[in-house]
Amino acid sequence: METRKLFYALAVAMPLVAANSADACTGITLKSDDGGVVVARTIDWSREEMDNIYVVIPRGYTQTAILPNNASGGMQYTAKYGYVGLGMEQAEFIVDGTNEAGLSAALFYFPKYGKYKPYDAALAGQSIGDLQFVSWVLANFATIDELRAAMQNIRIINIDSRADTVHWRITDPSGRQVVIEVVDGEVNFYDNPMGVLTNAPSFPWHRSNLNNYVNL
């Protein structure tokens, strides 16, 4: 199944460190009659222009995970798949992108509800920052099942303790989509047949809230 990406950078403003809950990104998924899948999103901020960059990463490119306080010894990974994306401030921090296998990944603002495991220097080689997670996903995986298996061996951490948490939307070439949230240090995968994701509260809350509108 073909996967196509649309990037919408609408009223963009400041980074996650200083954003407030009134700024809400929205992701949607459309399916065409021929079986194609289109994932799209807005990036809705409101204050000042963000330093966004378009990023193209080829197969074979090696990155090192950025750790808190510029600590050394971060996990290294070499791209199995080339990918393109919209970066925030630097090339490693991909907000939204897709790889050549047809898998797409995106992050969305998730303040007050998410909580990662604390950074442990002894586990630096297994740690990936929340803002670098999309890049790691796009570089390494073609399907959600592959990603889920690999998640058992990594720790998602907060690079900057001042920043709020994020959650992620992953869509693979089959059209399957999941939402990933880290709450109280635990990684949660939620199938997302609705194909819609916004910011906080948690995905289960949004799913339950739909019951209030089923009769409209």
Predicted regions and their residues:
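Bacterial N-terminal signal peptides that target proteins for export
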Residues: 1-9
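Active-site periphery "cap/insert" segments of enzyme catalytic domains
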Residues: 145-171, 176-179
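A contiguous strand-loop segment
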Residues: 24-122, 162
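Extended amphipathic alpha-helical segments with heptad-repeat/coiled-coil character used for oligomerization
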Residues: 165-216
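Hydrophobic helical h-region of N-terminal Sec-dependent signal peptides
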Residues: 8-16
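Sec/Tat signal peptide C-region and signal peptidase I cleavage site
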Residues: 17-24
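A short, charged
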Residues: 69-83, 141-145, 149, 205-216
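Alpha/propeptide regions of enzymes that mature by internal proteolysis
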Residues: 123-155
